[in-house]
Amino acid sequence: FCGGANPDDVRWTTRYDEAEPFGSLYGSLHETGHGLYEQGRPRHLDFQPAGHADGLGVHESQSRLWENQVGRSLAFSEWAIPHWAEHFPENMNDVTGEMLWRSVNLVEPSLIRVEADEATYNLHIMIRYEIEKQLINGELDIDDLPDAWDDMYEKFLGIRSPDRKQGVLQDI
C-alpha cells in the first residue's frame, strides 16, 4: 500500500516472507512506482484538479512499470544477483543473472493476484471486474460469490482455490 498527504509525504508498506523474499521485492518495486508517480506530480498545481493523479489506471501503470519493466528486466536481474548471492548464499551462489531473469518471468497460473506473473495478472483483474458487474447487475448474490469466484478462476486460469483466504477473500 502507498499513500501520503502530498508528493512530499509518500509512504508505503510491504509484506515480507523469509521463505519467499521475491514477493517482497516485487511488492516493494510496485509501491515504489506509486510513490514515484506521486512525487512526480507538478507541485505548482497542488490543491488544483490538474495537480491530482490522473486516475487509478495511470497510477497502476506506473507501479506495474517499475515492478515488471524494470524489476523483471535482464539488466535488473544481472545487477541484483550479486546482492541476492551475498545475502542468500545457500540458495543463490550458483544462480546467474540470466537464470534469475528467466525464473522471475515464468508464466503460470496462480491464485494470488499480487504474486501473479505479468501475463496472468491481467486475468486476475478481469475476473474481479466480471464478478463486480454481475454483483451490480443483480446477476450474482453475495452468498454465491465464493463459488462464482472459484468457477471463474477455473474457467480462465485452470485452477481453484483450496480455501477462501486464497480465493474470494484474498484482497481483504
Regions found by a protein language model. Give the residues of each.
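Catalytic zinc-binding patch centered on the HExxH motif and its immediate surroundings
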Residues: 1-8
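Long, well-ordered alpha-helical segments
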Residues: 32-40, 68-82
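Active-site metal-coordination segments of metallo-dependent hydrolases
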Residues: 48-60, 120
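An active-site-proximal "capping" alpha-helix that borders the catalytic cofactor pocket
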Residues: 56-70
